[in-house]
């Protein structure tokens, strides 16, 4: 054996020192205690200057863990209430896993099958609150490229849904108010027209609705003019007084709360809106000579809200077909579009309500005179059947003008004080006496209300009253509120609604003498509705209502009981409508001349309401067998019942997917139209037999429970097991038997899979001399006692090999023994003791391993069983843990360690107990080992490898 091999052996022993120091009670040069006690850390060793290295020979079991993870994509998501999910675990994937264990020379391999739970992704939307509204509508998956939106809170009463797609966003509002929580409205303004020739006259309108407050935003296209109208709930309005008068550009709305439902067989053509105006009177007493003044405020806010509701009617549905597209159209257009739209003009009502206030001694009584004039316009049918291409209307795209003009009816009645309608009330209050020099005042409220409804993406434009030339009248300024951005939803047909109103309030001061004041104004209020048919160019449908000769006359007299009266006249002189396509300079229009409507009263209250509504029907999407149906709830006109978008599921059979024998059936629950029972999508499982998978002897059966149509009992999928015997696997002598419990059809007792173990003898495995016998307990059929597997270990025979039984790498060509040169004992050879320390002794072939090899990769000596010897270190070997061993050509082993990028030789010695020590300076050993335990035996020893 040469010195190089000896050096390697010492190196391995050195590494083992760190771990085994506790067991060997190594002594520190500073005290007589253990060199490394159980609480000494590596840093403690460094401080003491005592280092050792360890390369453990302990064989540890290798454990292979197979993790099957299932992504829970609904953990932070609240799915739609109508979207049901099955709690049944489906198994759709499997993999074969082989687990092996090593023990001495006996290897056992067991192969099993792992069934991975099937995970289906359920699309859902998280909500900011737990009581979220109805499901959010989504676009057609075949044409929409938007991704699932996420939520971010914008304020306390609204929730904004945003998407990473720049062209898609949704603004919707919900409420935690249980009375209106089922209402959710989406607004989808279209993109700006391609031409801006008429943009100066356009205004965009957004409505953001909640249970208690909404904002109606009117914005000029060029962003030069902005008006915001508050939406005030009834409870808020009732507490208001004259001191909080509404500004001329603001409107007062009354909120109508209604539940949401759906009637699949009926088209909803209705609007439910409320129009009412508070009557407020103010009387004040002043003195021109500087005496004190008195003021009285009378608030006649209605206690009950008047409601006008149009009943649902049946109209033609919106259908979809598939004509071919023109090659000139952009690729972003839908593949087809053919839409027939029925536009119905509902009753236009002009109501003039007059009130006469009579001052008597201490009592004021309010009477109202109601004049009602109504007009009706018949339906207009527009047929959009051909895509728009270019700057003109193609054939089939021309609208049809109204078939008749409105017919007018008028009636006037005096409302007695005892039979006032629920929308108003008689006011009786005590007022001070009015002297001759009293200056009285009253309030004129003018309200204009419009309501629009249709089922296409739209933009509503409205211009407030443009002229109010009243003499001696003060106007309050408009409020400035934040502007709410527009919203857009691509490729989705919505049923949307906008309700607008402008209100002007004027206070006229009348001197004590008898005088008359007349006020008048001419104004035109155009209402423009811009629609976009899917991805086609912008189409503008506009209607305007023109009024003229709006006047008021106020007269007072000098009397103890003064009478205050006013007269006014208003005329709805013109109603016009037009349809203009973007890029076209021409417009198709119709106009109607309306006769003047006049009335006289002391307090003038004027309101005009109009309704433009596209007939609503279900939007359907036809699916084929194997597809999944779904239903999306969409917003409908304000005040009406919410409708739904229904996917047409083939009738009367289930939507099915045919599977072959051996496949697994599954059922998915889908949402159905609101109000009906949820249906399911059923995988067609062959009937009448079970879905089976034929197995051969030795296979494992399994059963999977699947969902069945709603209302029936869940079924199972059964693997066909050969009958009547057990499913068995034939093994030969030496194999291991096992039993696996499997699921059986629901209601039966679980069965087992039995490995056929030969009887009556043990299952044995023949091993060679040197192996270790062991017994393993295995499972037996259910109800029997567990048995064992016995390994037959032959009686060991004597071996003439120089290598130990654990040898894994030594051969006659690469192994050597290590001789210790200059030791006080001669001859001296290296062997490993029970703690793997390198020991120099005369009998190098006993008490442990004594044959080594040199590992050139790690530059270390290792034993035939892979153990690195441990060497005793001195205090100053701070780099000793990284030393290397080099074997010279003559076999001498050179110990070196790196320091400052250089290799320094290490010197050796032997201790009294024969352990080999390593140091960089032998003189340092003297003070440390001169004790009764670890005295040095010889210094400057050399290790040399002796080849066989």
From Swiss-Prot:
Quote the biased-composition stretches of kind Polar residues, using this chain's numbering.
Answer: 253-264
**Which species?**
Schizosaccharomyces pombe (strain 972 / ATCC 24843) (Fission yeast)
| Primary role | P cell-type specific protein which involved in agglutination during conjugation.
What spans are recorded as compositionally biased (Low complexity)?
149-174, 265-332
Q: Record's Gene Ontology CC terms?
A: external side of fungal-type cell wall; mating projection tip
The SS bond pairs are none
Sites where a glycan is attached: 31-32, 57, 383, 436, 469, 491, 522, 553, 568, 598, 921
> Which keywords annotate this record?
Conjugation, Glycoprotein, Repeat, Signal
Instruction: Note the superkingdom of the native organism.
Output: Eukaryota
Chain positions covered by the region annotation Disordered: 136-174, 253-333, 408-432
This protein is called P cell-type agglutination protein map4
Taking every annotated instance into account, which residue ranges of this chain make up the domain DIPSY? Answer: 796-948
Protein transport keyword on record? no
Q: Which GO terms describe its biological process?
A: conjugation with cellular fusion; flocculation
Which compartment or compartments is the protein found in? Answer: Cell surface
Q: Add the further remark from the entry.
A: According to PubMed:16857197 the number of the intragenic tandem repeats for map4 is 9 rather than the 5 annotated in the reference sequence, producing a protein of 1092 amino acids.
* sequence-type repeats, residues: 617-652, 653-688, 689-724, 725-760, 761-796
According to the record, the signal peptide region is 1-23
Record's family? Belongs to the mam3/map4 family.
Q: What is its main location?
A: other
Any one Pfam family here would be DIPSY
Looking at the record, which segments are called 5 X 36 AA approximate tandem repeats? 617-796
């Amino acid at each position: 054996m040469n010195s190089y091999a000896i050096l390697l052996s010492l190196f391995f022993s050195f590494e083992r020192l760190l771990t085994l120091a506790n067991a060997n009670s190594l002594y520190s040069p500073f005290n007589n205690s253990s060199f490394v006690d159980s609480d000494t850390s590596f840093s403690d060793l460094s401080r003491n200057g005592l280092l050792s290295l360890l390369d453990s020979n302990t064989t540890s079991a290798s454990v292979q863990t197979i993790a099957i993870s299932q992504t829970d994509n609904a953990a932070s998501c609240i799915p739609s209430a109508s979207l049901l999910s099955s709690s049944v675990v489906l198994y759709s994937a499997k993999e074969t896993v082989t687990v092996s264990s090593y023990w001495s020379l006996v290897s056992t391999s067991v192969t099993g099958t792992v069934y991975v739970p099937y995970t289906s992704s359920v699309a859902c939307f998280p909500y900011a609150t737990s009581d979220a509204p109805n499901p959010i509508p989504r676009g057609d998956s075949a044409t929409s490229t938007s991704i699932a939106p996420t939520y971010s809170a914008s304020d306390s009463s609204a929730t904004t849904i945003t998407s990473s797609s720049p062209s898609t966003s949704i603004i919707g509002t919900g409420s935690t108010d249980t009375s209106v929580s089922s209402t959710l409205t989406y607004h989808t303004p279209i993109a700006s027209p391609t031409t801006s020739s008429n943009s100066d006259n356009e205004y965009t309108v957004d409505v953001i609705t909640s249970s208690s407050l909404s904002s109606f935003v009117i914005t000029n296209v060029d962003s030069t003019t902005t008006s915001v109208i508050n939406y005030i709930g009834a409870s808020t309005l009732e507490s208001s007084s004259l001191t909080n008068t509404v500004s001329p550009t603001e409107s007062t709305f009354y909120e109508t709360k209604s539940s949401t439902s759906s009637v699949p067989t009926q088209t909803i053509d209705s609007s439910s809106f409320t129009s009412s105006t508070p009557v407020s009177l103010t009387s004040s007493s002043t003195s021109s000579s500087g005496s004190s003044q008195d003021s009285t405020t009378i608030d006649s806010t209605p206690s009950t809200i008047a409601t006008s509701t149009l009943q649902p009617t049946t109209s033609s549905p919106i259908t979809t077909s598939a004509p071919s597209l023109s090659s000139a159209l952009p690729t972003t257009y839908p593949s087809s579009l053919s839409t027939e739209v029925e536009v119905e003009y509902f009753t236009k009502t002009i109501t003039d309500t007059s009130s006469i206030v009579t001052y008597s001694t201490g009592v004021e009584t309010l009477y109202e005179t109601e004049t009602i004039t109504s007009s009706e316009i018949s339906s207009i049918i527009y047929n959009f059947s051909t895509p728009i291409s270019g700057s003109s209307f193609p054939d089939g795209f021309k609208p049809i003008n109204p078939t008749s003009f409105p017919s007018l009816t008028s009636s006037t009645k005096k409302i007695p004080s005892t039979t006032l309608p629920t929308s108003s009330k008689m006011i009786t209050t005590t007022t001070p006496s009015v002297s001759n020099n009293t200056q009285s005042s009253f309030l004129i409220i003018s309200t204009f209300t419009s309501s629009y409804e249709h089922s296409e993406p739209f933009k509503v434009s409205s211009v407030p009253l443009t002229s109010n030339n009243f003499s001696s009248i003060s106007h309050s300024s408009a409020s400035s509120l934040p502007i709410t951005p527009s919203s857009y939803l691509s490729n989705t047909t919505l049923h949307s609604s906008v309700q607008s109103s402008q209100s002007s309030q004027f206070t006229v001061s009348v001197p004590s003498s008898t005088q008359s004041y007349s006020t008048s104004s001419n104004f035109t209020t155009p209402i423009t509705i811009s629609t976009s048919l899917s991805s086609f160019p912008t189409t503008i449908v506009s209607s305007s209502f023109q009024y003229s000769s709006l006047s008021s006359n106020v007269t007072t007299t000098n009397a103890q009981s003064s009478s205050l009266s006013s007269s006014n006249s208003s005329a709805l002189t013109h109603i016009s409508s037009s349809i203009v396509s973007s890029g076209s300079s021409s417009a198709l229009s119709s106009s109607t001349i309306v006769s003047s409507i006049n009335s006289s009263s002391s307090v003038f209250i004027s309101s005009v309401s109009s309704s433009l509504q596209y007939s609503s029907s279900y939007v359907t999407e036809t699916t084929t067998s194997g597809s999944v149906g779904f239903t999306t709830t969409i917003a409908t006109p304000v005040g009406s019942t919410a409708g739904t978008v229904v996917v047409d599921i083939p009738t009367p059979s289930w939507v099915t997917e045919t599977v072959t024998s051996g496949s697994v059936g599954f059922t998915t629950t889908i949402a159905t139209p609101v109000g009906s029972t949820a249906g399911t999508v059923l995988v067609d499982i062959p009937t009448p037999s079970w879905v089976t998978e034929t197995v051969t002897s030795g296979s494992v059966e399994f059963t999977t429970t699947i969902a069945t149509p709603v209302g029936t009992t869940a079924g199972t999928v059964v693997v066909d097991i050969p009958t009547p015997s057990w499913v068995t696997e034939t093994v030969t002598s030496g194999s291991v038997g096992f039993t696996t419990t499997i699921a059986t059809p629901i209601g039966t007792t679980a069965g087992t899979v039995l490995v056929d173990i030969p009887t009556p003898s043990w299952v044995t495995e023949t091993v060679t001399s040197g192996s270790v016998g062991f017994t393993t307990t295995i499972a037996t059929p259910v109800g029997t006692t567990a048995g064992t597997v016995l390994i037959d270990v032959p009686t060991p025979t004597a071996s003439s090999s120089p290598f130990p039984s654990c040898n894994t790498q030594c051969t006659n060509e690469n192994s050597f023994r290590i001789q210790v040169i200059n030791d006080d004992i001669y001859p001296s050879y290296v062997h490993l003791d029970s703690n793997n320390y390198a020991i120099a002794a005369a009998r190098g072939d006993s008490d442990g391993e004594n044959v080594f090899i040199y590992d050139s990769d790690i530059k270390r000596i290792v034993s035939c069983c892979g153990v690195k010897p441990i060497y005793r270190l001195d205090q100053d070997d701070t780099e000793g843990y990284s030393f290397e061993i080099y074997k010279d050509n003559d076999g001498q082993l050179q110990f070196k360690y790196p320091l400052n990028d250089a290799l320094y030789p290490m010197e050796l010695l032997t201790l009294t107990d024969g352990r080999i020590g390593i140091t960089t300076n032998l003189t340092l050993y003297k003070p440390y080992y001169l004790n009764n335990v670890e005295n040095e035996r010889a210094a400057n020893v050399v290790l040399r490898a002796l080849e066989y």
